[in-house]
């Protein structure tokens, strides 16, 4: 990670650098119960997200969707009091005992919400004094697979759930003005 000077570097944490900017805060958000119902072209810069919800990031969308009446706007939070929630032995089974490769019973919450999709959108500006710097975007723990687009262009993807994902976004940025 880059620091502007020795004083910043001695503080060690990235957020102490003037080359660090957090994108935590309010984002536009759309939830879909499955991939077929997701907004397919939302990465386009002209896509209208004005009717999408506002959601504070970072957050679990399932928890953010809890309503006062007890219903959930964004799927159901899934709690497991077991260390491993997926089957990790490959043995033939005649009944459902869990497992990532099996279809759960229809009355289970995991049947209804097997592959939810959250689409996020945020605008930001690059500080003028970052001119000439490489700019990286870090995601510190997305819960699943995701694609990243900047200004309508595909940047990359990550499938490492809850791990750091880092992207060099320098070539995709508008250095003067807003980025989507």
Task: Give the ranges of each region predicted by the language model.
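Accessory beta-strand-rich segments of carbohydrate-active enzymes
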Residues: 13-14, 30-32, 38, 63-64, ...
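Accessory carbohydrate-binding/adhesion or oligomerization-edge regions at the termini
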Residues: 1-99, 155
């Amino acid at each position: 990670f880059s620091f502007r000077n020795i004083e910043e570097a001695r503080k060690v944490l990235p957020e102490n650098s003037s080359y660090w900017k957090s994108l935590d805060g309010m984002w536009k958000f759309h939830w879909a119960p499955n991939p077929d119902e997701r907004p397919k072209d939302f990465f386009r810069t002209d896509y209208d997200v004005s009717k999408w919800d506002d959601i504070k990031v970072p957050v679990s969308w399932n928890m953010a969707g809890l309503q006062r009446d007890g219903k959930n706007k964004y799927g159901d939070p899934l709690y497991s009091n077991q260390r491993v929630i997926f089957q990790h032995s490959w043995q033939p089974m005649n009944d459902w005992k869990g497992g990532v490769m099996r279809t759960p019973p229809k009355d289970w919450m995991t049947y209804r919400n097997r592959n939810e999709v959250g689409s996020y959108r945020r605008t930001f500006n690059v500080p003028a004094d970052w001119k000439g710097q490489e700019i990286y975007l870090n995601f510190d723990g997305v819960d699943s697979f995701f694609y990243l687009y900047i200004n309508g262009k595909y940047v990359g993807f990550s499938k490492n759930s809850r791990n750091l994902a880092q992207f060099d976004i320098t070539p995709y940025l508008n250095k003067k003005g807003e980025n989507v």
